[in-house]
Structures are given as C-alpha cells and as structure tokens.
Curated annotation (Swiss-Prot):
GO BP: mRNA processing; RNA splicing; tRNA processing
PANTHER family membership: MATURASE K
Similarity comment text for this entry: Belongs to the intron maturase 2 family. MatK subfamily.
A Pfam family: MatK_N
One GO cellular component, as annotated: chloroplast
Source organism: Phalaenopsis aphrodite subsp. formosana (Moth orchid)
Gene Ontology terms for molecular function: RNA binding
Protein name, per record: Maturase K
Role this protein plays: Usually encoded in the trnK tRNA gene intron. Probably assists in splicing its own and other chloroplast group II introns.
Length: 446
C-alpha cells in the first residue's frame, strides 16, 4: 500500500513528474481500478483472518452460520404460516463516504491507508458523476468491482450487528450468534459508557423490543422482519430502525420505506415473488363407535406467486414482447446463427422457469414460455425472410417444444429417482429449484 502512494501522487501531481495521466484516459481508470481492487483484497484478507480466529476461539462450527438462497424459501414456507405481522424494509443507500471511513477507522489503524481510502472514494465519486461515453472507460465503470462489494457488505454488517445483538439479548430462543462476527472495540466502548451513565437504560431497551417469535431475512438490499407479536411491537422496531440509521449513520431514513403488513390479509414482495399466507380449510370425518362427526380445521399455507406484470415488463425492456405481452422478434439477434438464437432464448427461458419454479400458479410460467417461444420463432422467421406460419410448417412445432421442454424433462427424471410420484403431479408441486450460478438478469430483486 505504501508503494501505491507514489503512483497516486504521480497521477495527481503531473507538473512535478513526467508521468502524467488524463482523468478521462484509459490508463488513468485502469490504474485507479487496480489500486482500488488491491486495496479491497488487502482489507478482505485482514478481515477474514480476524473472522477465522474469532471462530476458532469460540469453537463455533462455521456451518451454523452459513445461510444461502436455497434455505430462504423453505424457511419462509415453514415459519411464515405461524406468524402474524411482516415488516418490509429497504436498507437505505447511498451512504456518505466519510461515514464509511469513520466506521473503518476502528479497524484500520494505519493513517496513510485511511488517506488512500478517501482518495479512492473521491475518484469513484468523480467517475460516477462524469457519465463517460467512451467504451474503454465504460467497461470499468460498469463492472461490479470487488472493492465496492466489500464496502457494501461491511455497511450491511454494521446495520445488522446491533439488530442481531438486541435480538439475541431480548429472546430466550436459539438464534444466530452475533459473537462470530468481527469484534468491535468502539461498540463495546459505547455499551460500557451507557452502563456507567444509566444502568437501567439498556434493560429498558431490551424490554422495549422483547419478542420471542421474531425472524429476520435479508436478500441484497431488501429485508423482512416477521413477528408473532402485535402491531405495537412492530411499530417499536420500526421506530428503532429509523432512529438507528438517523443517529448512527447520519442518514435521514424515510419511515415510509418500512411497511408493516398483516400476513393473513396482505401480500408482500420479496426475491421476485408475491408471498402471502392463505387460510386452507380442511374437513376431517371422525368416527367413534356408532357416532360420526365432522371437524372443520383451518391451516395456514404460504402462497407464492410469480409477478407476471413485472416479468412482462422486464421482457418488454429486453425487446422480447410489447408492454401488453405480445411477442415480437429480437431484431438485433438476426445476424446470429440459428443455434445461437435458440440457445439464447432457451437459456433465458430455463433461468426464468427455474427461479420461479416455486410459484403456486403455473399459468404465469406457461405465459412466459409462450412469449419466449413465439419471440424465438418470429426472430428466426425474420432472419430467413419468411412468415412464422411458413417457418413453423417447414420445421415443425415439435422442434421448438422439444427444445424448450428438454430442461423440464431432465428435471422430472432427477426428482423421479428420489420421489415416486407421477409426471402429471410434478406441475402441481412447488419445487424450489434455484440456480445461483446462472441467476437470470430479468428478475428484479430490488
């Protein structure tokens, strides 16, 4: 890091040195990205070493603290049916860069490194404000840089740390331990200060937020807080989040970004699904000797629906259909080969159907498949300067159907080896078949 300081001073002071780089040049952004990426790798190494040492000291298995996208939907399906209220919140952004520097100051004791961090923040601010039009510079500004992802994860960690601490202290149930995270010297300093000033204040806060049935789930910049408590308790948590972001991060957080809904009556949007809790009536006939009677029971069931309006809107922006959902040809792909066109359409169709395989209404998936299949046929017909009817008559409609349903047949065979149910029952079952490696770009996770 100290050797990089000479490069930064050379770039900023071009009159003293013969090494001058223009801020809009390719080399300038290349070196700026290399410095930031290297700085991010160094920070990740230091933070990961502290995390591993903390895990070894506390002897906590790492597997208990791993949470993936594959476990979110089964968790919601198992827990939401027994809870009452859900709080839908968006993590506020963007945060002022100087606040991040002050937060990292308790971790980084090297003063030149903090100055380097401020310089990198300043360069990113200038890069985002210029809106460059050159392709060489646009490549660096469009990439999801590792350093920015590290800062985002660290910011989210700071937001969730105090919440996890209060959640653990105010509950007698087993929860994710907050001690496995990185130690914070200034946080415990504040706790000691509060203990000296007022011994009962912290206990009052814990009693103020006490709830033994509360769950927190976050994916990217959106999170949900689900509880079995009352509406008053959810409003208390809302008040806590608003004041926390306002006084700790100096960020004015609008209260309307946290929406509290009652699960049996409303639905909420999370991870590309509209989720709600439905009442499922069940009638059971009970026979006791000569008397028989009926027992009516109500069970709660999590209902997840793929948002067809948002999916069609995404397909419309990608020029696969109109705003109303009418398929159109993809004109910019007509210069590709037939196999490449089919491969691109089928890959998009597979990703969408995989991600939304847990939808309770399969008609949405059938409509998306219809749009992509007909858009593919229109694109191929436009390339060969023919009509869709003539093109399909020449190749046969079974060709496209077999190509699109190849993934579904392979998926059915995989599950048939484990669960012996009929093929026609597969369409009615919800299978959370999520593929992180091939996550589609058309799903809006915000």
């Amino acid at each position: 890091m100290y050797q990089q300081k000479y490069l930064i001073s050379s770039v900023s002071d071009s009159n003293q040195n013969g090494f001058s780089l223009h801020k809009n040049s390719f080399s300038y952004h290349f070196y700026s990205q290399m410095v930031s990426e290297g700085f991010g790798v160094i920070l990740e190494i230091s933070f990961s070493s502290r995390l591993v040492s903390s895990l070894e000291e506390k002897r906590i298995p790492k597997s208990q603290n791993l949470r993936s996208i594959h476990s979110i939907f089964p968790f919601l399906e198992d827990k939401l049916s027994h809870l009452n209220y859900v709080s839908d919140l968006l993590i506020p952004y963007p945060i002022h860069m100087e606040i991040l520097v002050q937060i990292l100051q308790c971790w980084i004791k090297d003063v030149p490194s903090l100055h380097l961090l401020r310089f990198i923040f300043h360069e990113y601010h200038n890069l985002n404000s210029l809106i460059t039009s050159k392709k060489s510079i646009y490549v660096f500004s469009k990439r999801k840089k590792r350093f920015l992802w590290f800062l985002h994860n660290f910011y989210v960690y700071e937001c969730e740390y105090i919440f996890l601490f209060l959640r653990k202290q105010s509950s007698y149930l087993r929860s994710i331990s907050s001690g496995v995270f990185l130690e914070r010297t200034h946080f415990y300093g504040k706790i000691e200060y509060l203990r000296v000033m007022s011994c009962n204040s912290f206990q009052r806060i814990l009693w103020f937020l006490k709830d033994i049935f509360i769950h927190y789930v976050r994916y990217q910049g959106k999170a949900i807080l689900v509880s079995k408590g009352t509406l008053i308790l959810m409003n208390k948590w809302k008040f806590h989040f608003v004041n926390f972001w306002q006084f700790y991060f100096h960020f004015w957080f609008q209260p309307y970004r946290i929406r509290i809904k009652q699960l049996p009556n409303y639905s909420f949007s999370f991870m590309g699904y509209f989720s709600s809790v439905l009442k499922n009536p069940l009638v059971v006939r009970n026979q006791m000797l000569e008397n028989s009677f009926l027992i009516n029971t109500l069970t709660n069931k999590l209902d997840t629906i793929a948002p067809v309006i948002f999916l069609i809107r995404s397909l419309s922006k990608a020029q696969f259909c109109t705003v109303l959902g009418h398929p159109i040809s993809k004109s910019i792909w007509t210069n590709l080969s037939d196999s490449d066109i089919l491969d691109r359409f089928c890959r998009i169709c597979r990703n969408l159907c995989r991600y939304h395989s847990g939808s309770s209404k399969k008609q949405v998936l059938y409509r998306i498949k219809y749009i992509l299949r007909l858009s593919c046929a229109r694109t191929l017909a436009r390339k060969h300067k023919s009509t869709v009817r003539t093109f399909m008559r020449r190749l046969g409609s079974a060709f496209l159907e077999e190509f699109f349903f190849e993934e579904e047949q392979s998926l059915s065979l995989v599950f048939l080896q484990k669960i012996p149910f009929l093929l026609h029952g597969l369409n009615r079952e919800r299978i959370w078949y999520l593929d992180i490696i091939r996550m589609n770009d058309l799903v809006d996770h915000s």
